[in-house]
From Swiss-Prot:
Pfam families: FTHFS. CDD domains: FTHFS (cd00477). One of its GO terms (molecular function) is ATP binding. This is Formate--tetrahydrofolate ligase. It comes from Corynebacterium jeikeium (strain K411).
Length: 562
C-alpha cells in the first residue's frame, strides 16, 4: 500500500519506518496475548511459532471465544487499496480502546514482493514487523510448502519410472510443481527429457506456491492429523482407465506431512503499535481461497476479545470464500465486516467519475449483507482526496444506509482509526454469540452440485446472468460426477479487477456470462477450483519489477521494500 496519507507532509518509506521502530521482545508480545512460555517456539528475538497442542493443553478448561471482524474491500486498482494497512491500524485502535486484540492475517508471497507489490505487511505507521523478515523468508513456511509440493511431484514421476504399478497415465498427471516466484516461463514445461534414465517425458508446469493445493490444505487443516488425512486425499492424476490416483496411493502422505510439521504452527509477530499478530498461510484470493490459516484464526479467537482477519481482494473473491469455504470448514461466526474503499478506486471503477464508481462499492456492500452481516465502510484517505469527494462518499453512505467512517492509518497508525474502531466496536458489542451464529451464513449449499453453486455465485455475487462451461470444463464436470466430487464447495479463480471474468469490465457490470474453462478437483483441500477467464496460476513479473528497487547494504540493512 503506497502513500495513502491524509496529509501532504513527506513521510519516510515503509521499510524506513519499520527499521526505525524498536520492536518489543517476542516474549513480551506472547505474554500480552496470553500465550504461556511452554507454547512458544522463538525464532530469534522478534518472531516465534506457537505450539498449538501445547497451548491447548495449557489452556484446557478455559472457555473463551473472541468476536471475529472480517476486513474486505471494494474492487481494487492494481496498486491495492490498503486493506491490510487499514486492518492493522484498526487493530491498534481497538487495543487502544481497551480490548484484548489480535490480528490474524496471511503471510506475503515472495513473488508479488519482487513483482508489483514490493512488500505486503501493511504500510506507513500501520505495519506488522519485522517487515523485512515477513516479506522475504519469514519462518520458512512458504519454503516448506514448496518442498512438500515438489516432493509429491517427484514421487509421482518416480513411481512411473520404476514400473508404474498403479498404472498412472503420464498424459493425465495433474499435479504441478510450484515455486514462490513470479516466473511466466515455467507455466508450461516438459519434464523427463534426456533418455530412458531421466524419467518419462511429459507435459507439466509450475504454479506459484500461494496457489498450490498444499497451501490451501495447510490453511484449512485443524491439526496435524487432519493435515495428514487431507494430504492423503490429494488427487495427482489418473490411471490409463481414468481412475483417480492420490498421494495416499503413492504412500507418501506421512513424508509430505513431516515436511510440514513445523509449518502448521502459526507465526507470532507484532504491529508497530504492539498488538500481537498471527501471520500464517498465504493463499491468493484470485487464484486460491484467499484466507489465512484456520488454525491461526481459531487460536486468536481462543486468546482474545476481538480478532481482526482479512480475506483477499473484494466481496466477490476473498470474502465470499471466507464465508463459503473457510467459515464452513471451521464453523466460524463473523460479528462485523469492514469494507475498505478509496477515492482512487471509486474513480478507477467509474472511468474517472467518482459518482459512477460508487456502484461498485454499493454492490460489495450488498454482497456482504447477503451473508447476513451488516458492514462498515472504511474510507482510506489519500492526500489527493478533496473535501468534496469525501463528502460525496459520506452522502452516498447515508442514502444507501451504510455507515462510512474515514481513516488515515498510513499517516497516523492506530490514532487514524479511532473513529473506525468506535464504529466497529459498536457493531461487535451489539452482536451476541447467538446472533452471530444465526445471522452470518453461506450463500450456497454444496449438496446442490457444482453447476448450481456456480450459477448462484454468478448471479448473486458477480451480477451475471448465466454460466457457460467450456469443452474442458464439461469433461471435468463429468469426471467430478463419476467420482462423487460434484457436491463440494467451489473456489472460483477469477480476476480481482471486475465482478465479471473480464478484467476490463470495471464498476458493477451485470447481465454478463461467467465463462468456466476448467474444473479442478482439490480433494485434499475439500473444494473444486473453477478456472474462469484468462486467470493464470503462476503470475509473471511486470515490465519494471519491484526487485529493481530492492537492495541491501554492507551491514545487511535492506532498502526498497515499500
Amino acid at each position: 500500500m503506497t502513500n495513502s496519507s491524509a496529509t501532504s507532509n513527506p513521510q519516510p518509506s515503509d521499510v524506513e519506518i519499520a527499521q526505525a521502530h524498536t520492536l518489543e521482545p517476542i516474549t513480551t508480545i506472547a505474554e500480552r496475548a496470553g500465550i504461556p512460555e511452554a507454547a512458544l517456539i522463538p525464532y530469534g528475538r522478534t518472531k516465534a511459532k506457537i505450539d498449538v497442542p501445547a497451548l491447548r493443553a495449557e489452556r484446557e478448561g478455559v472457555n473463551k471465544k473472541g468476536k471475529l471482524v472480517l476486513v474486505t474491500a471494494m474492487s481494487p486498482t492494481p496498486a491495492g487499496e490498503g486493506k491490510s494497512t487499514v486492518l492493522i491500524g484498526l487493530a491498534d485502535a481497538v487495543r487502544t480502546a481497551g480490548r484484548q486484540t489480535m490480528v490474524a492475517i496471511r503471510e506475503p508471497s515472495q513473488g508479488p514482493v519482487m513483482g508489483i507489490k514490493g512488500g505486503a505487511a501493511g504500510g506507513g505507521y500501520a505495519q506488522i514487523v519485522p517487515m523485512e523478515d515477513i516479506n522475504l523468508h519469514f519462518t520458512g513456511d512458504m519454503h516448506a510448502i514448496t518442498a512438500a509440493t515438489n516432493t509429491l511431484a517427484a514421487m509421482v514421476d518416480n513411481h512411473v519410472q520404476h514400473g508404474n504399478a498403479l498404472g498412472i497415465d503420464p498424459r493425465r498427471v495433474t499435479w504441478r510443481r510450484c515455486l514462490d516466484v513470479n516466473d511466466r516461463s515455467l507455466r508450461h514445461v516438459v519434464t523427463g527429457l534426456g533418455g530412458p534414465g531421466q524419467g518419462t517425458p511429459r507435459e507439466g508446469g509450475f504454479d506459484i506456491t500461494a496457489a498450490s493445493e498444499i497451501m490451501a490444505i495447510l490453511c484449512l487443516a485443524t491439526d496435524l492429523e487432519d493435515l495428514k488425512k487431507r494430504i492423503g486425499r490429494i488427487v495427482v492424476g489418473q490411471t490409463y482407465d481414468r481412475r483417480p490416483v492420490t498421494a495416499g496411493d503413492l504412500k507418501c502422505a506421512g513424508a509430505i506431512t513431516a515436511l510440514l510439521r513445523d509449518a502448521i504452527n502459526p507465526n507470532l509477530v507484532q504491529t508497530l503499535g504492539g498488538t500481537p499478530a498471527l501471520v500464517h498461510g498465504g493463499p491468493f484470493a484470485n487464484i486460491a481461497h484467499g484466507c489465512n490459516s484456520l488454525i491461526a484464526t481459531t487460536t486468536a479467537l481462543d486468546l482474545s476479545e476481538v480478532v481482526l482477519t482479512e480475506a483477499g481482494f473484494g466481496s466477490d473473491l476473498g470474502a465470499e470464500k471466507f464465508f463459503d469455504i473457510k467459515s464452513r470448514a471451521g464453523d466460524l461466526d463473523v460479528a462485523a465486516t469492514v469494507v475498505v474503499a478509496t477515492i482512487r478506486s471509486l474513480k478507477h471503477n467509474g472511468d474517472s467519475v467518482l459518482k459512477a464508481g460508487l456502484a461498485n462499492l454499493e454492490r460489495h456492500v450488498s454482497n456482504i449483507r447477503k451473508f447476513g452481516v451488516e458492514p462498515v465502510v472504511a474510507l482510506n484517505l489519500f492526500s489527493s482526496d478533496t473535501a468534496a469527494e469525501r463528502s460525496m462518499v459520506a452522502d452516498w453512505g447515508e442514502q444507501f444506509g451504510v455507515r462510512v467512517v474515514e481513516c488515515s492509518v498510513w499517516a497516523e497508525g492506530g490514532a487514524g482509526a479511532a473513529d473506525l474502531a468506535t464504529a466497529v466496536l459498536e457493531v461487535v458489542d451489539g452482536v451476541s454469540d447467538e446472533d452471530a451464529s444465526s445471522s452470518s451464513h453461506q450463500i450456497y449449499q454444496p449438496v446442490d452440485g457444482v453447476e448450481a453453486t456456480l450459477h448462484t455465485l454468478a448471479t448473486e455475487i458477480y451480477g451475471a446472468a448465466d454460466v457457460q462451461f467450456g469443452p474442458q470444463a464439461l469433461k471435468d464436470l463429468a469426471f467430478l460426477k463419476d467420482n462423487g466430487w460434484d457436491k463440494l464447495p467451489v473456489c472460483v479463480s477469477k480476476t480481482q479487477y471486475s465482478f465479471s471474468d473480464d478484467p476490463s469490465a470495471l464498476g458493477a457490470p451485470s447481465g454478463h456470462t461467467l465463462h468456466v474453462r476448467e474444473l479442478v478437483p482439490r480433494i485434499g483441500a475439500g473444494f473444486v477450483v473453477a478456472l474462469t477467464g484468462d486467470v493464470m496460476t503462476l503470475p509473471g513479473l511486470p515490465k519494471k519489477p519491484a526487485a529493481e528497487r530492492i537492495d541491501v547494504n554492507a551491514q545487511g540493512v535492506i532498502s526498497g521494500l515499500f
